[in-house]
């Protein structure tokens, strides 16, 4: 049996995204340890048989002294744990975890590119300044890893084009997958007016929140009874939306903000159409996969990570980024023809079963990692 160590940016989000993988490894007798900066789900991890070790990693910003401390801390922990396999997720855990593994001379290293995020979006002066450093660190990380997992072809193509990684080391997986049993189509959804839309995401600009609000304004002038829901936590991302801005939207009665939840299923169950107008460099948004598994049509953008989940006119619609008018037009299709909700929703479930079953995704990952 193998000793597997995961280095992740937030244990809370990692558990939500990858619980099935962790449970399958523990169930098969492997020793599993998770390293992360947040301790909020330590007890939950322990309950499923996963050891937790806190490691000081700041997932945003660049502080050379603090980051050096993080790397040295990782070197010590990896040396103490002596894992057979080290699997790193997201930017800093990939960069620092792989370097620490090399310095500790322990384990086979796999990196997981779950989207490119903030650094590969719009280029601010700060991003332009940091990018050469990030590229150098990425090249070092990939040079010494045994394999890399990507969630869409665009990200893989970018990383091979700029010579971060050799194609033969890379594997494309269909996101983190979705548990088709836990997220299944409920009974009782009628698809009748008024139609209710829901967006589930971190409350950051790059998830298309502003476009969603503007589309809601456009539609509510014609259809005041439609439901416009928004669910998700506030964030510290550089494009985070402030709570006072949300209060303004709530007072305007343009959106029903539902806050944060541990279980999105009741909210999906009470909604008709899932919307994610993101221009964040996604991997494959799990929120979309969960909605698809529950038999919901999807409106999202023609961007890497999002566009792969929708076959236009089959299980939903793709719209241009930062285009509230086009988004409103796509949303209106379901208002004018509510029958699309049931038909396209059934197609979403079909795609989820064929392509995004979490057990198939995890089997692929474990096969590559040989565990």
Write out the residue ranges for each language-model feature.
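Conserved acidic donor-binding segment of nucleotide-sugar-dependent glycosyltransferases
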Residues: 311-313, 317-324, 333-339
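Acidic donor-binding loop of glycosyltransferase active sites
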Residues: 269-283, 296
């Amino acid at each position: 049996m193998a000793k597997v160590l995961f280095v992740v940016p937030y244990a809370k989000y990692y558990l939500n995204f990858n619980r099935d993988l962790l449970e399958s490894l523990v169930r098969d007798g492997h020793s599993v340890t998770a390293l992360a900066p947040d301790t909020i789900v330590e007890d939950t991890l322990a309950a499923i048989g996963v050891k937790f070790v806190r490691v000081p990693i700041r997932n945003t910003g660049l502080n050379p002294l603090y980051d050096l401390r993080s790397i040295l801390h990782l070197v010590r922990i990896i040396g103490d744990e002596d894992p057979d396999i080290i699997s790193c997720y997201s930017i800093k855990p990939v960069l620092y975890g792989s370097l620490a593994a090399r310095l500790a001379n322990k384990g086979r290293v796999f990196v997981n590119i779950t989207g490119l995020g903030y650094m590969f979006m719009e280029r601010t002066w700060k991003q332009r300044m940091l990018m050469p450093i990030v590229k150098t660190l990425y090249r070092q990380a990939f040079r010494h890893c045994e394999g890399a997992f990507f969630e869409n072809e665009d990200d893989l193509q970018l990383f091979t084009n700029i010579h971060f990684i050799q194609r033969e080391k890379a594997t494309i997986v269909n996101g983190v997958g979705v548990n088709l049993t836990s997220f299944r189509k409920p009974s009782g959804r009628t698809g009748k007016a008024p139609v209710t839309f829901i967006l589930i995401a971190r409350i950051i600009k790059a998830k298309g929140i502003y476009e969603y609000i503007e589309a809601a304004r456009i539609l509510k002038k014609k259809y005041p009874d439609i439901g416009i829901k928004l669910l998700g936590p506030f964030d510290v991302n550089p494009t985070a939306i402030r709570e006072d801005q949300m209060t303004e939207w709530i007072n305007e009665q343009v959106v029903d903000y539902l806050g944060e939840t541990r279980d999105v299923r009741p909210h999906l169950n009470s909604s008709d159409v899932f919307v994610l107008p993101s221009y964040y460099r996604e991997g494959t948004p799990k929120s979309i996969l969960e909605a698809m598994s529950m038999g919901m049509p999807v409106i999202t953008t023609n961007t890497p990570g999002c566009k792969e989940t929708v076959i236009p006119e089959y299980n939903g619609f793709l719209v241009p980024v930062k285009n509230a008018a086009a988004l409103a037009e796509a949303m209106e299709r379901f208002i004018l023809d509510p029958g699309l909700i049931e038909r396209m929703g059934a197609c979403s479930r079909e795609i989820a079963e064929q392509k995004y079953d979490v057990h198939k995704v995890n089997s692929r990952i474990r096969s590559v990692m040989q565990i």
